[in-house]
Amino acid sequence: MSKIRVHEYAKKHNISSKDLMTKLKEMNIEVSNHMTMLDDEVVNKLDNEYQAEKPSVADEFEVEEKVVRSKKNSNKKKKKGKGNEDKRQENFAGRQQTQTVETPDKITFSGSLTVGDLAKKLSKEPSEIIKKLFMLGIMATINQDLDKDTIELIANDYGIEVEEEVIVSETEFETFIDEQDDEENLKERPAVVTIMGHVDHGKTTLLDSIRNSKVTAGEAGGITQHIGAYQVELNDKKITFLDTPGHAAFTTMRARGAQVTDITIIVVAADDGVMPQTVEAINHAKAAGVPIIVAVNKMDKPAANPDRVMQELTEYELVPEAWGGDTIFVPISAIQGEGIDNLLEMILLISEVEEYKANPNRYATGTVIEAQLDKGKGTIATLLVQNGTLRVGDPIVVGTSFGRVRAMVSDIGRRVKVAGPSTPVEITGLNEVPQAGDRFMAFADEKKARQIGESRAQEALLAQRGEKSKLSLEDLFQQIQEGDVKEINLIVKADVQGSVEAMAASLRKIDVEGVKVKIIHTGVGAITESDIILASASNAIVIGFNVRPDVNAKRTAELENVDIRLHRIIYKVIEEIEAAMQGMLDPEFEEKVIGQAEVRQTFKVTKVGTIAGCYVTDGKITRDSGVRIIRDGVVIFEGQLDTLKRFKDDVKEVAQNYECGITIERYNDLKEGDIIEAYIMEEVKR
């Protein structure tokens, strides 16, 4: 008999991998994960164990009979009791009325209470409370608001404890959108999967192959509507795939605080190996903290070498299970549809072990996958429901937009009325187009949804989206002191691989006040827009060694407020990071020439010195600028302006093509033909 894996045995005997692993531990048999091999001896032990637990047919029949009998009895009891139910309720209500109202031990309130409200909560007459307030020197009417201190004073007089409830504003629903539900309300949901990888390694082909071979039963041959996400079914279990365009969308969502993906599939071509975008995808997935499955594609090619792919990926801490690691590698051929079932089974296996759950019995919350404006339908948004159930007609707030769900379309183009957890749907009915990554929440009341949506839109105008504080070396020390930073994320780019490794190794050794450096991505070549997007999503600082950012990277860094540091000497990088962490980073200044003036004539004045009659030939000369005197192309003096005049008046600046009078501090040897160059020192944005 050949060896069998844990998950294969579980599948064969119709039990979950998790239950089987628990059983093995009870039997004192160590297994590391669901891919562990079981030998013949262990398999025999398990067979005996499960055989012993299995009830006989007679037992099963007896149990079933008891259940049926108990159901019948309960129905009889219900019938008997039905006639007297109203009488019992009347008697109970009567008894309640005759009972005296007891004083509570504790009351709760939020904000303030009126005298009448406080009297109700304390089970007292309002006149009694007014009398007590009068005794305290407070003249109050029944509708007058009382502050927290007064409420506590009155309640304490009756020996009643007071608790103030802090109400979280529903406008900021992101703060409580991810609150954990009670365990008994949670039910299994499909896993949400994102496919990433290098260009031309077969991401799109894999998505198409999965979609075409595994559309839900009855939909084969139907036109699949592209809504940015879709579901497939295998063994009566669903999997949701996000068809996000590239890594940028993935990180943009993460930058907005939306964690939509449960599992990431990294596609690597067997004939091409690990490429720059593959590494990028790995770092994006690691930064998101989700399980990774490696799909080794193009196995049908003659040059396919899966061992090489495995070897290369071990450098990025993705060690295959066959080599003692815990990363699942699945060989596939997307174009021929080979290995697709195995890949989907691995996704279901991870789902089973991770136990992805949500509460379907609440108002829906989730994330926008994509959105657009359609001429005929208006605003169309693809939403991924992450918790709760979304229904047609639900009032909804999406980012800063709001509305009522007018219509819902599934990934196969069918109109649906409800969408549960992990279901992607396209909706209409919003007042404006939201952004990918915006969170949404359904509400019971349309008026409330409108009010919250308008408030959020107003707040967004006051504080522009994306202006959240990004980590920079200037404020690093302050953030460390305030306890905001426990780990510094860095992205390292250099001109050669040797420099990358040397710099990363040196940076990892830095440890100041328990704050450590974490390198989230390294690479060779110019700093790209993709690096900046990853830095923005992960709140990281980008360090370039002998490389520069390209035009798009510069523009994106300015928009996202990402700190880029460029260096030519490794120890300077280390010194700068350490200095920043210790709060000793000095600001860096850069000289900027703002203008030049030519000396046309000189005048010697007693007690004043030499006055130069000048003509501004370029830019401008300002009163607070530094100056240098240039004679025959050589700088002969550097200092400060003493006076700057137009005719007899002191002025702050003189523009190009105007004349002026200039005196220089502690320098009188000015001659006709000298050039006075004005400059200022500007702090460099690092």
From Swiss-Prot:
Span list, region G4: 297-300
GO molecular function: GTP binding; GTPase activity; translation initiation factor activity
Composition-biased stretches (Basic residues): 69-81
InterPro entries assigned to the protein according to its UniProt record, in alphabetical order: EF-G-like_DII, IF2_II, IF2_N, P-loop_NTPase, Small_GTP-bd, T_Tr_GTP-bd_dom, TF_IF2_bacterial-like, TIF_IF2
Region described as G2: 222-226
Chief location bin: cytoplasm
Segments of this protein annotated with the region G1: 197-204
Stretch list, region G3: 243-246
SUPFAM superfamilies: Initiation factor IF2/eIF5b, domain 3, P-loop containing nucleoside triphosphate hydrolases, Translation proteins
Localization of this protein: Cytoplasm
Any GO CC annotation of this UniProt entry: cytosol
Region (Disordered): 54-105
Function: One of the essential components for the initiation of protein synthesis. Protects formylmethionyl-tRNA from spontaneous hydrolysis and promotes its binding to the 30S ribosomal subunits. Also involved in the hydrolysis of GTP during the formation of the 70S ribosomal complex.
The name this protein goes by in its record: Translation initiation factor IF-2
